[in-house]
Regions:
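Active-site loop/oxyanion-hole signature of alpha/beta-hydrolase fold enzymes
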Residues: 40-43, 49-92, 96, 107
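Short catalytic micro-motifs in class I SAM-dependent methyltransferases
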Residues: 27, 95, 99, 103, ...
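Conserved HGGG/HGGXW glycine-rich cap/lid loop of the alpha/beta-hydrolase fold
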Residues: 5-66
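Active-site micro-motifs of SAM-dependent methyltransferase domains
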Residues: 30, 55, 98, 122, ...
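Alpha-helical elements of Rossmann-like donor-binding domains used by nucleotide-donor carbohydrate transfer enzymes
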Residues: 34-37, 41, 72-79, 103, ...
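Flexible "cap/lid" loop of the alpha/beta hydrolase fold
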Residues: 102-107, 112-145
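Residue-level detector of beta-strand structural context in well-folded domains
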Residues: 1-2
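Conserved alpha/beta-hydrolase catalytic His-Asp/Glu region
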Residues: 127-131, 145-176
Length: 176
């Protein structure tokens, strides 16, 4: 298993294929395996790199909340590129990973050949922000009180994934 180091945190990463590199950044509640179908296809012509974000084993899981932020997520992705001596790559991210990819493009544009940013923001329209904040607070309480395994069930079945369930019932069932 390969590990990149980002500020003392070990990030599990994998590489396959050859050619111009593509860095895949996974979504919340996913991991490097989320990209397996894409990597199987693109590794025929590209050097594909995926990794588990901090907090997602086998990457390190720091206890202190100060070790998690959008700035740190960007630094982690750059650390993975540096681990493989990659100056420039296509950056592909989904949801949480899409937000990181977007910020890589804004802060480290010279490192990105292209950005593929999918579902990078949940947010809420102005009229629903208070309701959205309450839902997020309830989910955060579940994670803190019950741990990630039980909270994942709340997340998978809650309003956070209703659009996934509506658009792709088979994919949603697999996600659960």
């Amino acid at each position: 298993m390969a590990y990149a180091n980002s500020g003392g945190v070990k990030l599990h990463c994998e590489e396959t294929g050859s050619g111009h590199p593509i860095l895949f950044i996974h979504e919340f509640a996913g991991d490097h395996r989320s990209w397996e179908p894409q990597i199987r296809y693109f590794s025929r012509r590209y050097r594909c790199i995926s990794y588990d974000a901090r907090g997602y084993p086998p990457s390190d899981v720091p206890d202190d909340a100060a070790h998690y932020s959008q700035d740190i997520a960007v630094a982690d992705a750059i650390a993975v590129l540096d681990h493989y001596d990659i100056d420039k790559a296509h950056i592909v991210g989904l949801s949480m990973g899409g937000f990181a990819a977007l910020h890589i493009g804004m802060r480290h544009g010279q490192r990105a050949s292209a950005l593929v940013v999918a579902g990078c923001g949940y947010g809420a329209p102005k009229g629903k922000q208070e309701s959205f904040q309450r839902e997020v607070d309830v989910l955060a309480d579940h994670f803190e009180r019950d741990g990630s395994e039980k909270a994942a069930e709340v997340y998978a079945g809650g309003p956070y994934r209703v659009q996934h369930r509506n658009k792709d019932p088979r994919g949603w069932a697999e996600f659960r």
